[in-house]
Structures are given as structure tokens and as C-alpha cells.
A protein has these predicted regions:
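Residue-level detector of alpha-helix initiation sites
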Residues: 22-23, 109, 155
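Intrinsically disordered, low-complexity terminal tails and inter-domain linkers enriched
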Residues: 53-82
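Alpha-helix C-terminal capping/helix-to-coil transition sites in glycosyltransferase folds
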Residues: 12, 96-97, 144
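ADP-ribose/adenylate-binding Rossmann-like module
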Residues: 100-104, 111-137
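Glycine-rich, highly charged phosphate/nucleotide-binding loops
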Residues: 80-96
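An accessory alpha-helical subdomain
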Residues: 155-220
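Hydrophobic, well-ordered beta-alpha structural blocks that scaffold small-molecule cofactor pockets
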Residues: 1-44, 48-52
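E1/E1-like adenylate-forming module used to activate ubiquitin-like modifiers
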Residues: 127-176
Length: 220
């Protein structure tokens, strides 16, 4: 059975990532890209994640947590405000209050345990490379501002989805991302000015086609 494609607003939503390796880093990057608040629980973290921390984890609070370094990290300051690292082993209570959990450790048994706990408590969970333990999976995606295209093979062939992503990148360019922003800015004005759905559809199509043909975003 294919997975249902659903785009979810993750802005400021709580996401837990268990694990501190390169796979965990990639998941952190994705979740930050879509505005989530990310908590990472791991006994140790890879260099890429370490670059997000304050003075290479030199400063921790009394709970063992440490936050991102806004001046010395590779993300923007907004993203830095949305990352918390907890340096210790995973505990089940870490999942409480989370809307999404990603088990990205190198211990399949632990990933399975995390997934089972989340499913029993109604929490969406992804166990990396353990399809049977996942209630959702990550697609390959392209993102230009608010314009997003995603591909999923249902976990069967990541290589195929990467191929599709590469082909789509030839079409979904930064220009289209900018054009999508423009279309959003004029949307309410067009809706107010034209009374029928058919008229609005015609106007939107004319504006879109003209912009693509000219290779230029119209001025508002």
C-alpha cells in the first residue's frame, strides 16, 4: 500500500531526534528547514551536529542540555533558537509531548523500542532504515521557498526517488520559487477583483504563463 502524501505545517512543532550521527544530522537539517523545534538526545554527536553547539559542548546547563551557538553555527539565528541537545542516553519520557519522533541511532533494537513506545502513545515515528517500525517515512524533496516537490517509493527504492529528485531539479528552479511567492502575494487581490472561479483561474494562468515566458517576476 502506498503512503498517503500529506504536507504538514511543522512550524514550532516539537520534534525529537534520538541519535547523534550523520543520519541524525540529516534529519535535523530537514526538520529545521521546515520550521520545527528540534530536540536531539544522544550520548555523543557527530562533527556536523557539534558545530551547532556552544563552544563544542563546553557549556551545559544542570540538566545536561546545551543549545545552539548563534554566532558560530552553520544555520541561521532563527534555526539556532529551535535546537536543543541533551547529552545522555535516551529515556522513554523524552518522547512525551513530542508531535514527531525520529529514531536515528545505530542500534536497531533501540530504534524498534522507541517506535513501539511512540505507536502505543499515538506519536508519529520514523525509525531510520526500519520500514516496518515507521508510521511515516521521509520523501526525497526539493524546496524553493514555499514551493515543494516530494517523491516517495514507499521505502522500496531510495535510489529511484533520488533519481526523480535529480530530474525534477531541472524543472523546479529558484525562479519558480520566487514566482510562487509572487502568486501568493497577488492571490487575494485577484480573488477580490474577479467574481467567478473561471475568471480567476484564467487570470492566474495568464500571469503565470507570461512570467515563465518572459523569465521575469512581475512587479506588484
Amino acid at each position: 500500500m502506498a503512503y498517503f502524501p500529506m504536507f504538514v505545517d511543522m512550524t514550532e512543532r516539537e520534534c525529537l531526534i534520538v541519535g547523534g550521527g550523520n543520519v541524525a544530522y540529516r534529519k535535523v537539517s530537514v526538520m529545521l528547514d521546515f520550521g520545527a523545534k528540534v530536540t536531539v538526545v544522544a550520548e555523543d554527536i557527530c562533527d556536523e551536529l557539534r558545530k551547532l553547539t556552544i563552544d563544542d559542548i563546553a557549556s551545559e546547563d544542570k540538566t545536561g542540555s546545551y543549545t545552539a551557538n548563534k554566532e558560530n553555527n552553520q544555520t541561521d539565528s532563527d534555526a539556532a533558537d529551535r535546537i536543543t541537545f541533551i547529552k545522555r542516553r535516551f529515556e522513554r519520557k523524552d518522547c512525551d509531548g513530542m508531535e514527531m519522533v525520529i529514531a536515528a541511532t545505530d542500534d536497531n533494537a533501540l530504534n524498534h523500542e522507541i517506535a513501539e513506545y511512540c505507536k502505543a502513545n499515538g506519536i508519529m515515528v520514523n525509525a531510520v532504515d526500519q520500514k516496518a517500525d515507521c508510521s511515516f517515512i521521509f520523501p526525497s524533496y526539493i524546496k524553493e521557498k514555499n514551493l515543494v516537490a516530494a517523491f516517495s517509493s514507499g521505502g522500496n527504492s531510495p535510489v529511484l526517488t533520488q533519481y526523480l529528485k535529480c530530474k525534477e531539479q531541472e524543472i523546479l528552479t529558484p525562479f519558480l520559487g520566487e514566482l510562487n511567492e509572487y502568486m501568493g502575494q497577488i492571490r487575494e487581490k485577484v480573488i477580490a477583483q474577479y467574481g467567478t472561479e473561471a475568471e480567476r483561474k484564467r487570470v492566474f494562468k495568464e500571469i503565470l504563463c507570461a512570467a515563465i515566458d518572459n523569465g521575469k517576476i512581475p512587479e506588484i
